[in-house]
Structures are given as C-alpha cells and as structure tokens.
C-alpha cells in the first residue's frame, strides 16, 4: 500500500478513537434520569447531577493541555494508546458506581483519559497534511467528533433498552477501547526518538487545571432559589480560580518550558480563534442539554421522545462540519467562521420564540411552509458545524508546527470550557430566571384571582404557571446563546486570513508506521502531496526553508 494510503488509514483510525471518546461526552444526556433514580435524586432536582456531565468535561479540559504537549514529546501513537487504556479504566469505575460521588470520579477519569484522543488526532492531521489542504481533513476529524454527538444520545437509549440498565453504556466501552487500541497500534505512525525531546510543563498544566476546576465548582449551584445566581461558596471559590489563573500566567512568563512557546506564535489570530471556539462550545452545550429538557418540561414528552428532538440538530452538525472544512479551503477560515456563527445566532433567536405549541407551529415562507422545530434546530446545527474545521485550522496556522499538539489541545480546551460555561453558568442563571418568572406569574395570578378556586383548580393553574415559566426560562437561555454566537462571530473577524500562516519547515524526526518499519518514499505521482517527514531526503535539504513562501509542502514543521 502507498504511503498516501497509510496516511489516510492513520487518520481514519485516529478518528475512530475520537468517536469513542465523543460518544461518552454526550451519552449521559439521555440516560441521566435512569442514573438519578439509581443514586436517589428526585427528578425535579436535575441540577444536582450536572457534575456527571461537568466532571467528564473538567477531566477532559484539565488533562488536555498536558496531554497535547506530551504528544509533542512522546509521539501521537503512544498518547492515543494511553488515553484509550485510561478511558477503559474510567468506564469500569463508572459502571461499578453505586453513589453520585463514585460516579463523578469515574467520569473524571474517563474525561481525563479521553482528553488525549481528539487533540492528538488533530495534531496528527496537521503533521501529515499541509496548511493549505488540512482544513478539509480537520473537518473530517471534527465530523467524527460530532458523529459522537449525533450517536451519543441515541446510543445511550439503545443500550439501556437492550440491556435494561444504564451501566451497560459504560461496560461496552471496555471491548471497544481494546479494539481501538489494536487498530491504532497497526495504523498510526510511531515516532522515532530524538536527541532532545520536548519537555512537558507540568506546573503550568496543574495551575491551569486548578483554575478551571475552581471555576466550575464556583459556578455550580445545586439549589437555585431565584435570589442568587451563584451558590454561597461561589464568590470565594471563583476568587481562588482567579488567583490560580494569575499564578498560571505568572509561571508561564518565567518558566523555561511552557504549555505554549510564544516564539513564532501569532497571538491575535490564535487567541481570537480560541475565544470563538469557546463561544461555539457554550452554544453547543446549551442546545444539547436544554432542547431535551424543553421537550420534557414544556412539551410533556417522555425521556426517549424528548431525546429524539435533538436528532434535527445532531444530523445537521456533522453535515455542517464537512461543508465548513470544504468551504474553508476555498474562501478561507475567517469568512466561514463569521457566516457559521451568524447562522447559528439566527437559529437561536428563532428557538427563543418557541411556545408550548411549537410542534404544530410552521414558518410561513410564502410559497411553502416549514416546521418550526425541525427548521430552527437544523439551522443551529448547520451553523455550529460550519465552524468546527475552520477554527481548528486557523489556530494551527497561527503557531509553529512544533506546537501543533498543544495548539490542537487548546482549541478543544476552549470549546470544552465553553461547554462548561454553557451548562454551569447559563444553567444556574436559567434556573434563577425560572424562579423569578414563576414568582412574577404567581403574583399576577393572585392579583387577578376572583372567586375562590378548588384544590384541583389551584393545582391546574399552578401547573400552567410552571409550564409558562419554563417557556420563558428557555427563551432567555436560547437568546443568551444567540448573543454568545454573535460575540464569537465578531471574534472570528480577528483570525488569520486565507493565506496567512506561520512559516513551516521540515520536521526534526521521521515517523514510521505500524511496528516501526520504514515507509517507502512516495511514488512520483504522489510527490506533490507527500508529507516531507515521510520522504528520505538529505538533512541539509530538510533543514532549509522553502524558497517560495507560497509553495506549501505537506507536513513541513518549524525547526525546533
């Protein structure tokens, strides 16, 4: 098989690992009621189990910067293998859990281990494809991630239906992880040792993890009362997070080894792409969590039917990812990000006007009509999907190739932080607004009361008020998501243009495939698209920059 074929197999195997990690990011969304029943939490206290979701995301975020940098030192293949093994261990802990504490611990282990899968695969794509053509490849990897979002909720329902208990969702991960490890072993390139391997900034990674962890804890309010958005411990804990963040930046300023080496980094487009990724992540999680809750709380649907409402969004998301990667190679990352987030913002504005009759409502477009719920969710999914590949590509083009591992991790960290904010901050604020709306409706009903009502009439009126308060709360949340998307679109204007990227040089090492056997050079017909780290060229040629800046050869790396 040609080296080009090996390259495609490698990225396919990496995408499979990404899919496995992505499934468990979203799988608990549709089985959370079953989990609540087992751990003894009432259905009207759903905010108490958000650590099951945030624990996974926090582990993902906290570990990812270190794992991204570690992949630059130890190689992509090793980190993916370690991630899959740890993921299997975390799945066993989660499946054996009998209380909320152990369940959250298992989810944190899962998230920490799976933190390697997506960023390292994205970095692998950056290693093997040129800056000019990698956007579509990154879009494909992003589509694998979003396929996890598509399959995850339905996957959970299917396994619970098949095995009659939610633990099966996590037991199934063990053989799947083993299969993926075997495939990765024979598919991904092994990195040869170099004289001076990259060092890992452990202190910086720990400080960043502490800052993020304290932020999540400070935003988590298990008992919203309509008077305080944050819990009683919120402000002190957030102050501690701020101190940890300041310590992180101070350390990064003086440390010899840093999570992101500033040399060669174009910070304006780099930070803009990360901030836009954060906005996209917040909007994504708002949709995944609140659409299903809208179905249960407002439309009165059961868990399975409410989960199926997400299908419109989840199908459009990977389609948008593929289209976005294709478009970015032709019109540039900046324009695609701007268009995608503005489309998503428009969709959220439409969703914010949903009523209790949304299933019957239709958009009147003159010559024809479209169902409101289906159309609005598809618009949001398409818009958020469009930006997945371009945001990653823009971030990687703003840093030297030696930083691709940590830069890929930074993209996903930013997105996951946004997801955490979406479920923690907007969720707490949403329940705060719910209690405010409920109090307002109750006061209005008391003022309008005429003759005394029977107990049944009072209960019916109260149920109506609760439903109206839920509609108003979700309207507020989705409108906030629209604002977040507009902010992300404006930030997208600051990312790199179509032809702006850090100058790339040849890599300092030549990876090999499978069991370490050397790869034959590309055939002459493949030479124009061959990653140069796989070519047997003289060292003096590899160390020289290209004479023509426009001549982008795939896989060129900045010299260390």
From Swiss-Prot:
Assigned keywords, A-Z: Antibiotic resistance, Cell inner membrane, Cell membrane, Lipid transport, Lipid-binding, Membrane, Transmembrane, Transmembrane helix, Transport
Q: Which Gene Ontology biological process is one annotated for this entry? A: response to antibiotic
How does the record say this protein sits in the membrane? Multi-pass membrane protein
Task: List all membrane-crossing ranges.
Answer: 16-36, 48-68, 78-98, 108-128, 143-163, 168-188, 200-220, 229-249, 269-289, 307-327, 336-356, 368-388, 411-431, 477-497
Indicate where this protein resides in the cell.
Cell inner membrane
Q: Which InterPro entries match?
A: MFS (IPR011701), MFS_dom (IPR020846), MFS_trans_sf (IPR036259), Sugar_transporter_CS (IPR005829)
Per the UniProt record, the site (Forms salt bridge with Arg-426, probably closes bottom of cavity) maps to 146
Q: Where is this region: Beta-hairpin?
A: 362-371
Residues marked Forms salt bridge with Gln-157, probably closes bottom of cavity (site) = 415
- Where does the record place a coiled coil? none
Q: Which GO terms describe its cellular component?
A: plasma membrane
Q: What induces it?
A: Part of the lrpG-MSMEG_3069/MSMEI_2992 operon.
Question: What does the UniProt record note about how this protein's activity is regulated?
Answer: Resistance to ethidium bromide is inhibited by reserpine.
Q: Which Gene3D superfamilies match?
A: MFS general substrate transporter like domains, Multidrug resistance protein D
The SS bond pairs are none
Q: In the UniProt entry, what is the domain comment?
A: Has a canonical major facilitator superfamily fold with two N- and C-terminal domains of 6 transmembrane helices (TM 1-6 and 7-12) and two other transmembrane helices between the domains (TMA and TMB) that form a hairpin. Between TM9-TM10 is a periplasmic beta-hairpin that extends along the membrane plane, TM11 and TM12 helices extend into the periplasm. Asp-24 is a possible protonation/deprotonation site.
Recorded hits in PANTHER family, A to Z, give:
MAJOR FACILITATOR SUPERFAMILY, VACUOLAR BASIC AMINO ACID TRANSPORTER 4
Summarizing the function annotation, the protein's role is: In association with lipoprotein LprG transports triacyglycerides (TAG) across the inner cell membrane into the periplasm; TAG probably regulates lipid metabolism and growth regulation and plays a structural role in the outer membrane. TAG (and maybe other lipids) enters the central cavity of the P55 transporter from within the cell inner membrane via clefts on the cytoplasmic face of P55 between TM5-TM8 and TM2-TM11. From there the lipid is probably transferred to the hydrophobic cavity of LprG.
Instruction: Give the protein family.
Output: Belongs to the major facilitator superfamily. P55 (TC 2.A.1.3.34) family.
Under which name does UniProt file this protein?
A: Triacylglyceride transporter MSMEG_3069/MSMEI_2992
Q: Which organism is it from?
A: Mycolicibacterium smegmatis (strain ATCC 700084 / mc(2)155)
What taxonomic ancestry is recorded? Bacteria, Bacillati, Actinomycetota, Actinomycetes, Mycobacteriales
């Amino acid at each position: 098989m040609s080296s080009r074929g090996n390259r495609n197999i490698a990225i396919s195997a990496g995408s499979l690992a990404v899919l496995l990690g992505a499934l468990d990011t979203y799988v608990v969304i549709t089985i959370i009621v079953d989990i609540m029943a087992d751990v003894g939490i009432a259905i009207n206290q759903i905010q108490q189990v958000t650590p099951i979701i945030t624990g996974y995301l926090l582990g993902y975020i906290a570990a990812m910067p270190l794992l991204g940098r570690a992949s630059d030192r130890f190689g992509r293949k090793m980190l993916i293998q370690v991630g899959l093994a740890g993921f299997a261990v975390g799945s066993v802990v989660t499946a054996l859990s009998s209380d909320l504490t152990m369940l959250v611990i298992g989810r944190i282990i899962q998230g920490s281990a799976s933190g390697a899968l997506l960023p390292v695969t994205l970095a692998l794509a950056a290693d093997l494809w040129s800056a000019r053509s990698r956007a579509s490849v990154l879009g494909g990897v992003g589509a694998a991630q979003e396929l996890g979002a598509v399959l995850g909720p339905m996957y959970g329902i299917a396994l619970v239906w098949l095995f009659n208990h939610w633990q099966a969702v996590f037991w199934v991960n063990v053989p799947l992880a083993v299969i993926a490890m075997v495939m990765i072993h024979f598919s991904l390139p092994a990195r040869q040792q170099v004289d001076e391997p990259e060092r890992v900034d452990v202190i910086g990674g720990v400080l960043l993890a502490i800052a993020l962890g304290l932020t999540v804890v400070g935003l988590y309010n298990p008992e919203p009362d309509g008077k305080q958005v944050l819990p009683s411990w919120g402000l002190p804990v957030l102050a501690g997070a701020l101190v940890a963040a300041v310590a992180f930046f101070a350390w990064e300023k003086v440390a010899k080894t840093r999570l992101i080496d500033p040399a060669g980094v174009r910070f304006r487009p780099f930070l803009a792409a990360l901030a836009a990724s954060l906005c996209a992540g917040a909007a994504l999680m708002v949709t995944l969590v609140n659409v299903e809750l809208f179905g249960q709380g407002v439309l009165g649907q059961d868990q399975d039917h409410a989960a199926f409402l997400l299908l419109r969004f989840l199908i459009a998301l990977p389609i948008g990812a593929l289209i976005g990667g294709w478009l970015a190679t032709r019109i540039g990352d900046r324009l695609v990000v701007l268009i995608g987030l503005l489309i998503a913002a428009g969709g959220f504005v439409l969703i914010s006007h949903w009523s209790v009759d949304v299933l019957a409502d239709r958009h009147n477009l003159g010559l024809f009509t479209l169902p409101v719920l289906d159309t609005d969710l598809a618009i949001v999914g398409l818009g958020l999907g469009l930006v997945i590949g371009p945001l990653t590509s823009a971030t990687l083009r703003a840093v030297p190739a030696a930083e691709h591992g940590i830069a890929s991790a930074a993209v996903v960290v930013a997105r996951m932080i946004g997801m955490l904010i979406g479920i923690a901050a907007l969720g707490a604020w949403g329940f705060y607004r719910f209690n405010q709306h409920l109090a307002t409706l109750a006061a209005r009903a008391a003022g309008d009361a005429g003759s005394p009502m029977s107990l049944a009439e009072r209960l019916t009126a109260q149920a109506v008020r609760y439903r109206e308060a839920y509609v108003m709360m979700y309207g507020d949340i989705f409108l906030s998501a629209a604002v977040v998307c507009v902010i992300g679109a404006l930030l997208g204007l600051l990312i790199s243009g179509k032809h702006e990227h850090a100058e790339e040089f040849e890599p300092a090492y030549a990876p090999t495939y499978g069991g370490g056997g050397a790869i034959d050079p590309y055939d002459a017909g493949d030479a124009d698209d061959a990653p140069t780290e796989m070519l047997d060229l003289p060292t003096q040629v590899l160390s020289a920059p290209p004479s023509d800046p426009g001549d982008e050869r795939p896989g060129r790396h900045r010299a260390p």
